[in-house]
Amino acid sequence: MAYEIYIGDRMFSSWSLRGWLMLEKFSLPHKVQLVGLYSGTMAQEMAHLAPARLVPALRTPEGTVVGESLAIAETLAEQNPDAGLWPADPAQRAAARWLAAERVAGFSALRSECPMQLAHIYEGFETSGAVQADLDRIETLFAGACGVVC
């Protein structure tokens, strides 16, 4: 049996992209259910799955529904321990979880001022101080992570 992942358009929704990408990257069998993220139908389409009516939402082969990227990651890791979703080493795994949590909850200026739109080329964008601070933090996190997680 396969997982079902409920997402919006991966070109415009980083939340949707994250949910789908975990399944793709680790070759876990899945079926994509696209919901109307921008058509106004998402809340109705998601009502039977998730009280928050947000994407992504995952239905496991057993029928359990899980929302939120990190909860989905944890569920997939538990159900597929050999897939390598998290590092095997406890210290590396803790660092990876920290990075993932900060990615989900942090960088508000970057998300606010730089919406995800993979089909558009932005020219002449001037980085605000807040966005630059987020970018600097990302560089610091990933530079440090390669000594711990990579």
Task: Give short role names for the model-derived ranges.
Residues M1-S128:
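GST-like domain detector, emphasizing the conserved glutathione-binding G-site
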Residues E126-C146:
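Amphipathic alpha-helical packing segments from all-alpha helical-bundle domains
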Residues F107-R111, G144-V149:
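Short, structured loop/turn "capping" segments at alpha-beta junctions
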